[in-house]
Every structure is written in C-alpha cells, then in structure tokens.
C-alpha cells in the first residue's frame, strides 16, 4: 500500500516567539515534498499568545491543527497524546524551541521510505551549555549501565515513527510513557540521523531542574531494577556490619571492663548514619511506588478543552 500522508506533531507551552517561525519552516519543507500532511500543535495551557498565533495560522491553513489542553498536563503526557491523535502513515515529533532543525524532516522521510520504522535525530554536538551537554551524556551512560534496555544516547524523541510503531504504543496504553525508552523496548531497528543542536530561538527554556529530575527518575523506574537490588544488598551488608560492630563492643567491654568506655558519640553517629540511609532508601522505594500508582490510576493522558481543524 502506498504511503503518502505525513503527520508532524509539536508540543508547546508559552512559545509565542517560536511557533510562527517554526510553522513557516515546516510549511516550506512540506511543500517541497510529494506528500499530503497534517501539522498538529498541542498547547499545554499556555499563558501567552501562543494559542492566538496558532489559531490565526490555522484559519488560513487547514493542514494546521491545534489541540488545546484543559490544563498543563506536563512534558510527558501532552506530546504522547498528540502522537496518538495523528493519522499519518508516519508521525514526526518536532519540538517548538527550534533547537532541533526542521530541515532534518526530509532525511527522516528518506530513511522511512527506505524501510526504517523508527528514525531518530541524535545530537553529536550542541550549542547549549557545555556542562549540561556533558551531564546529559553522563546520564545516558549511567542509564545504559543499569537499564534492562539500552537507551540511545542524546536522542530526545525528535524523529519519525511509522504508523505501526504509533499503533503499538497506543495499544500499550502507558499513562506516563518514557518515549525514548518505549521506542527501544518495541524492538524495531532504530536509524539514527546525527545533527548539531542549535540554541533556543526565542524565549527561555521550559525545562526546570524538577522536570529534569522527573525525566531521570521516570527512565530509572521504568527500565531498571538495579536501585532496588542495591537496597537489598546494601541492607544485608549493613546488617552484617552492625553485627560485627556489636560483637567488637561486646568483646572490648568484656576484656577491658573497667577501662573501656563506649561513650555516646559512636551511638549518635550510627543513628544519624543509618537514619539518613533509611531516608534515602525509602525515597528510592517511593519513586517506584509513585510510578506504580501513576499507572494503576489509569488516568487519561490529557483532557482537551478545544480542537481546531479536526474533522
């Protein structure tokens, strides 16, 4: 069956300085290709003029569609919902900040035409903060040491997914999906397209330290049991060490009954040490329990307040 329809998805939140420029770049690229297409923006309850700008553009272009969320459903759920609303033979995820070059759309489609079911852009260099780029590399290195599936380094989800891949993800029905891990778990070979990431075009980054932490813990809790195993092993080791220390103090007291004074300092240090370890381990367990709770609630990815140009 001939494949001739492409979906492009862009999640946005307060991107009034970027959405029109991004739209015009994508429009120019898609006009040069022999494909019908739809361009879906999903707005995460922006407080600036983002929705107004996209709405005006959509009045002139029926290929441009807009989903407006009832509230901000976060950086994980909103993009995934938009991917599921796409109807193309392939779906391309493109971020709104213009750091990822829209010009790569042609290469993604070329690789797809050659048979690839998943094509991802891979950052080989970046104009962003050097420290952040280095920390991201360390994160992927850590993930691949502890993960049951190998996460592809420096891939943010920017790329193309065949309709079959989108349908498989929809059937999984994960209420809080880690996209870059999900694509690897599906099992199809992934074609990588290297590129240099640009600086954000306009506005400030929407990625806070809390969002980065959420990404990290989502990846770990979904793809690794290593932290849980470490807790088990460490707990056994500490128990054994505590027994040895207790035997040492007992022997010292018996042998040097009159002169050996245990004192309160070792006990106080031990209490604080083991208390802090317990708090840390409870926090790790809490992350896994929170992840389970998110899934058993079976909440929808998002609730929409409005759609524009959808039939």
Annotate each predicted stretch with a short phrase.
Residues 67-85, 102-182, 198-217:
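Acceptor/aglycone-binding surface of glycosyltransferases and processive sugar-polymer synthases
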Residues 10, 23, 35-45, 67-68:
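Short beta-strand/loop segment that forms part of the nucleotide-sugar
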Residues 17-21, 48-57:
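Acidic helix N-cap motif at the loop->helix transition within catalytic regions
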């Amino acid at each position: 069956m001939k494949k001739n329809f492409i979906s492009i998805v862009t999640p946005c939140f307060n991107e009034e300085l970027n959405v029109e420029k991004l739209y015009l770049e994508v429009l120019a690229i898609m006009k040069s290709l022999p494909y019908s297409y739809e361009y879906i923006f999903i707005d995460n309850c922006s407080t600036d003029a983002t929705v107004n700008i996209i709405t005006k553009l959509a009045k002139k272009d029926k290929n441009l569609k807009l989903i407006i969320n009832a509230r901000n459903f976060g950086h994980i759920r909103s993009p995934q919902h938009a991917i599921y609303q796409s109807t193309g033979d392939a779906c391309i995820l493109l971020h709104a900040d213009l750091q990822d070059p829209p010009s790569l759309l042609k290469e993604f489609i070329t690789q797809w035409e050659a048979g690839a079911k998943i094509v991802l852009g891979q950052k080989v260099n970046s104009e962003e903060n050097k420290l952040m780029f280095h920390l991201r590399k360390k994160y992927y290195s850590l993930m691949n040491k502890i993960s049951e599936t190998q996460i592809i380094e420096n891939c943010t989800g920017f790329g193309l997914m065949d309709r079959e891949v989108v349908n498989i993800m929809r059937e999984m029905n994960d209420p809080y999906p880690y996209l870059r891990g999900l694509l690897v778990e599906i099992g199809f070979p992934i074609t990588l397209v290297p590129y240099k990431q640009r600086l954000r075009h306009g506005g400030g980054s929407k990625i806070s330290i809390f969002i980065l932490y959420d990404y990290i813990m989502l990846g770990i809790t979904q793809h690794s049991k290593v932290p849980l195993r470490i807790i088990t092993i460490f707990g056994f080791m500490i128990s054994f060490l505590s027994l040895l220390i207790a035997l040492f103090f007992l022997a010292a007291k018996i042998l040097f009954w009159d002169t050996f004074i245990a004192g309160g300092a070792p006990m106080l240090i031990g209490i604080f040490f083991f208390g802090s370890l317990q708090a840390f381990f409870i926090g790790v367990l809490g992350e896994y329990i929170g992840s389970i709770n998110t899934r058993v609630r079976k909440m929808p990815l998002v609730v929409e307040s409005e759609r524009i140009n959808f039939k």
